[in-house]
């Protein structure tokens, strides 16, 4: 199924869980984390330094592989929509087919969201048979509007089930997932609708108008409306952040869209645990490790590290100080 592609077992395949892909581009290019070179280890031709310094080009294989992965899933989604539409046109077509079409459209919109967020101007490819000569770059605002329209059109047909909980809709696109994507889109409307980010000005969320049902509101009101919808479907913040990451976290009322790590359902890979540990960290715990991603100074300052007012969530998020054998 399409959901087999959300996670993955190979580098650059999957929205999360694997290396050298979407997660790395959204983490190791920011002021949150970096993957340092220690000695000669993990220099990799300057790959990781280049990501952190925003010094990359067309030959960066992490960027190229992420682009190819996202469009691969979009083309597969197009094929699914085309096949479902064929079935819908039959006289004996079951009524619930429209729900499946909406689910795939919203699923495809999620992948376009990642392309919009990471690349800005991207081609809108809506057919599995579009020849390369007809693949043209779309303006960032046009991609934004397409994603919003697809998600809003799909909403009435999506189930309200909690996608993070085991059952028929485990790991699937549901109404809460679509609402969280819409909230994120409008929260970043000033970036996503800015077609010229070099002129020193940008659109204003307070004046950007959007229709939700029969009401016309501004972007900030749209964010609130979709967040209220999510809350109304039974979501709330956990009292302790770390509870969202326990082994059996399916009951979480905060997690909205998760990738199932279930050998009986969707078998996916989660490399970040051992990847975040340095070899010596892993050795202390009797586990594997790699060169170890590191928090930046900015991140440590944000958490109040090495001060009298360190954020209580710091210990749940980072290895720091002396790492001891738990035995």
How should each PLM-predicted stretch be described?
Residues 96-103, 142-150, 208-230:
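Extended, well-ordered alpha-helical scaffold segments
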Residues 114-117, 123, 162, 188-197:
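Short coil/turn linking the two alpha-helices of tandem helical-hairpin repeats
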Residues 2-15, 36-119, 131-145, 149-167:
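Conserved, well-structured interaction surfaces
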């Amino acid at each position: 199924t399409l959901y087999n592609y959300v996670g993955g077992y190979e580098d650059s395949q999957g929205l999360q869980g694997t290396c050298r892909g979407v997660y790395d581009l959204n983490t190791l290019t920011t002021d949150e984390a970096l993957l340092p070179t220690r000695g000669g280890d993990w220099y990799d031709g300057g790959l990781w330094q280049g990501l952190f310094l925003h010094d990359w080009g067309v030959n960066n294989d992490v960027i190229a592989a992420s682009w190819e992965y996202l469009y691969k899933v979009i083309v597969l989604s197009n094929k699914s929509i085309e096949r479902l539409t064929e079935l819908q046109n039959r006289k004996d077509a079951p009524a619930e087919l429209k729900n499946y079409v909406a689910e795939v459209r919203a699923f495809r919109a999620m992948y376009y969201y990642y392309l919009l967020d990471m690349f800005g101007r991207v081609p809108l490819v809506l057919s599995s048979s579009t020849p390369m000569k007809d693949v043209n770059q779309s303006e960032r605002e046009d991609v934004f509007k397409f994603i919003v329209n697809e998600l809003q059109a799909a909403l009435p047909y999506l189930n309200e089930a909690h996608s993070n909980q085991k059952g028929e809709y485990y790991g699937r696109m549901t109404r809460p997932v679509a609402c969280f994507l819409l909230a994120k889109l409008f929260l970043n409307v000033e970036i996503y609708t800015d077609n010229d980010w070099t002129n020193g000005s940008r659109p204003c969320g307070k004046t950007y108008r959007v229709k939700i049902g029969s009401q016309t509101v501004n972007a900030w009101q749209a964010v609130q409306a979709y967040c209220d919808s999510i809350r109304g479907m039974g979501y709330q913040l956990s009292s302790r952040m770390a509870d969202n990451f326990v082994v059996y976290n399916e009951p979480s009322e905060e997690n909205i869209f998760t990738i199932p790590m279930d050998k009986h359902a969707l078998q996916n890979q989660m490399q970040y645990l051992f990847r975040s540990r340095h070899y010596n960290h892993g050795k202390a715990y009797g586990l594997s490790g790699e060169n170890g991603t590191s928090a930046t100074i900015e991140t440590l300052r944000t958490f109040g590290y090495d001060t009298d007012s360190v954020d209580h969530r710091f210990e749940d998020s980072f290895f720091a100080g002396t790492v001891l054998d738990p035995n």
